[in-house]
Amino acid sequence: MIRRMAGQWPAWARPEHPVLRYELGKSKRLSTRARLLRLAAMAIGVILLGVAGYLIATGLLTHPPGQSVTESIHAVMFWPLLAVQFLTGIAALTLTASTVADEIQRRNWDNLRSTALGAELALHARWAATFYRLRYLLGAILLLRLVLVGGILYDLTAFQGRYLDLLMNGIAPELPLVAGVLLLSLLMTGALIAPVTAVGFDGALGLLLSVVVRQRTYSILLQVLATFIRLAITAGLLHAMTQFMRGALAIDGAASWLLAAGYGGLADWGLAFLDLGVYGELWVMVPFGIMLGLALLLFALFQAFLADQMIALAVRYSERHG
């Protein structure tokens, strides 16, 4: 998956490949009316999410969303974007979790397995198709994150360009300004890569489930279970992180760093870190907190590695166990 992110696309991941073209062609072509209705529904959804985000950020219109423009933008966007990210991850899982069951239902699976590289290409194509089908959601997530990255760059110009100096004052460990700039750039890189690798990981997990559990009923039950587990992890880490930031959770040292790193990697894919005010607070509250951006980037790359391994495992399992 890391090679794919670098632009080295294999043949089966390109839309002109016949297997991927067949996979993408399974979706029913929508009429003009259906497309317009879908666009209208999406527009209404965006408006509702924006209104909900503003109401949450302002405490039901009782206070401003933030003390600055960038803080306000982040506060309004946080909850809607978190919800969209969660739904995108679940969608990636469900799009691949029934891969083998679908092919068995179409009576194609035995033919694919008897053809050289047939099952392997089918599994790879289904995984690649996930990105094509979720491209609009992923594109929206990345676009909004780019807006937040732009907010960070804008904030760095505050105090005559000395804002980063002020944030790094008194943190542990003490680092030169150039190191702070480098680590902040790694955060922004990790925050843009994490959604892509998370979708790839969820899609690969669904693919692995599909070759192990082929009965549709059990597959659906596992998907529901995975959704609840994901929701519990996200909600638990979000609650713990909120309590920690408010000073209501008495942890320090390595425990606080692991909480912040786990939250950034598993709960919101580094979304909270894209508010430079919040991220600067973590530098002070958490030992080595300035390294959280590096941790997020490494976690995203590790997710990509795990996705590759799960896809390879799914291919081997399908070849050995039919």
Predicted regions and their residues:
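Hydrophobic alpha-helical transmembrane segments of membrane proteins
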Residues: M1-N108, L121-G322
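Short helix-to-coil transition segments within interhelical loops
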Residues: R113-E120
